[in-house]
């Protein structure tokens, strides 16, 4: 029954939930209406698709937050005002917390039924591999920022429904009381029934043009160094990224930036994370790994052509991308890497490529995409699966560890959130993690964005340089016009300065 509150036993407690038709609500409207003050996250299927973009998830008002750098971490409990420093491997701490939260799945509900949502930064790889510490961390964003939430709102886009779910606090469950959780679900249903209200978003401006760290000449020089490593036999392919920055107007709200990026470049693994003093804005097209039941899936993207200006040329461009020998070879090499990663945690003989060399179209580019799946080994869990796949081979290269050593040498700055992931870990054991490409991080008055591409032996450096600019184009367009307070620069498409 629409809006009726249901109480379900889940083994270790109860889940209280209700649902109603989605109607005219969208994930951004839900976030604007329901997200509470403070840290919050929206995982947004801005491009709906049965396989990749079915669910959107909103969490705020977390019961606990795990954040920090390296192994110097902190558990914070906002409801109690308590902070507890901890020293340890973040993957182990995450596993321990997920085990404490574990609950039986309620049939018929979306896979996320409360749990942990948030950021896994690229630098977490230093907890998995010994890498040289030569890059500079000038952005200061945590390596991880995870919200543990007993309340969530989930959209099932294919079913056209929105769900509110809540777990009573453990002590209240023991006493048989779940009034607060029930009241919250009822309040959400009442707010949804009233429908969206007009909102006025705060502006978001940059105050000077976006500038790449490397000019064209430097980028071509670095590509040549990568190709020398390839010729020496160190690696087969390296995914080299360059960073762009822009100053941000004081007090501007990154939520406005997210809305612009979503409109320009809708993507199935989009997301917005509001941290303590930073924000991550993403329109990612790529899934790192998903676990649902015992089925594991990864969806690598490798191979990019610029989207043609004319829709009439789109089919020809996609066909040319699929037929391009270099793009095909690079893609198949990375599919093999993903098969190997999944093979570390999946049952022998279950790894299969069930979609190969498909094309996906986005606002500025066309991508080659495949889908790899397997069955998780009974002795492995979602954290084992994450460790096996993280970070994605499509954004490091082949072989992965040597590529990361080379990237640490050649890229001058921490990647931070870029090429890490936004993730959910459901109390039911489900997990889904994107790869944070097409993303912007905002902190301390600056916006940081990256764009990269795979370098192989026969890469044309000039073409690779322009590919990074094409990939950055949607992000630069979303950053938009320079503030009117800065005279002389007004056009969106002139908001990036290239040397």
Regions found by a protein language model. Name each.
Residues 1-499:
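Extended alpha-helical targeting/anchoring segments
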């Amino acid at each position: 029954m629409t809006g009726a509150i249901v109480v379900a036993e889940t083994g270790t407690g109860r889940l209280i939930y209700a649902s109603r038709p989605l109607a005219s609500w969208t994930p951004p409207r839900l976030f604007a209406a329901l997200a509470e003050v403070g840290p919050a996250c929206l995982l947004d299927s801005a491009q709906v698709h049965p396989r990749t973009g079915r669910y959107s998830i909103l969490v705020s008002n977390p019961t606990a937050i795990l954040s920090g750098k390296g192994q110097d971490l902190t558990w914070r409990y906002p409801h109690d005002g308590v902070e507890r420093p901890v020293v340890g491997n973040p993957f182990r701490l995450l596993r321990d917390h997920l085990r404490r939260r574990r609950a039986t799945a309620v049939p018929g509900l979306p896979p996320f039924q409360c749990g942990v949502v948030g950021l896994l930064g690229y630098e977490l790889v230093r907890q998995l591999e010994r890498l040289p510490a030569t890059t500079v961390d000038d952005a200061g964003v945590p390596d991880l920022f995870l919200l543990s939430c007993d309340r969530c709102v989930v959209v099932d886009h294919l079913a056209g429904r929105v769900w509110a779910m809540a777990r009573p606090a453990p002590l209240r469950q023991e006493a048989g009381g779940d009034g607060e959780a029930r009241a919250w679900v009822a309040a959400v249903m009442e707010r949804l029934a009233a429908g969206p209200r007009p909102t006025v978003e705060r502006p978001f401006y940059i105050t000077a043009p976006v500038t790449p760290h490397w000019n064209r000449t430097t980028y071509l020089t670095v590509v040549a160094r990568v190709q020398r490593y390839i010729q020496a036999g160190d690696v087969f392919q390296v995914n080299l990224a360059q960073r762009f920055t822009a100053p941000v107007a004081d007090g501007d709200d990154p939520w406005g930036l997210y809305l612009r990026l979503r409109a320009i470049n809708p993507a199935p693994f989009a997301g917005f994370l509001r941290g303590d003093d930073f924000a991550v804005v993403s329109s990612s097209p790529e899934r790192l790994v998903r676990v649902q039941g015992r089925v594991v899936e990864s969806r690598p993207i490798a191979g990019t052509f610029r989207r043609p200006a004319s829709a009439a040329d789109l089919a020809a461009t996609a066909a040319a991308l699929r037929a391009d020998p270099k793009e095909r070879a690079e893609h198949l090499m990375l599919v093999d890497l993903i098969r190997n990663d999944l093979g570390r945690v999946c049952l022998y003989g279950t790894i299969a490529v069930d979609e190969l060399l498909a094309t996906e179209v986005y606002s500025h580019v066309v991508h080659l995409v495949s889908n790899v799946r397997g069955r998780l080994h009974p002795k492995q869990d979602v954290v084992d699966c994450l460790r096996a796949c993280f970070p994605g081979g499509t954004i490091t290269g082949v072989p992965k560890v040597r590529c990361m050593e080379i990237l640490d040498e050649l890229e001058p700055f921490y990647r931070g959130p870029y090429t890490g992931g936004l993730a959910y870990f459901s109390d039911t054991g489900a997990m889904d993690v994107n790869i944070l490409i097409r993303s912007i991080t905002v902190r301390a008055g600056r916006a940081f964005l990256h764009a990269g591409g795979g370098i192989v032996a026969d890469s044309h450096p000039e073409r690779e340089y322009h590919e990074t600019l094409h990939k950055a184009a949607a992000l630069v367009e979303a950053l938009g016009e320079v503030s009117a307070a800065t005279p002389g620069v007004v056009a969106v498409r002139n908001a990036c300065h290239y040397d």
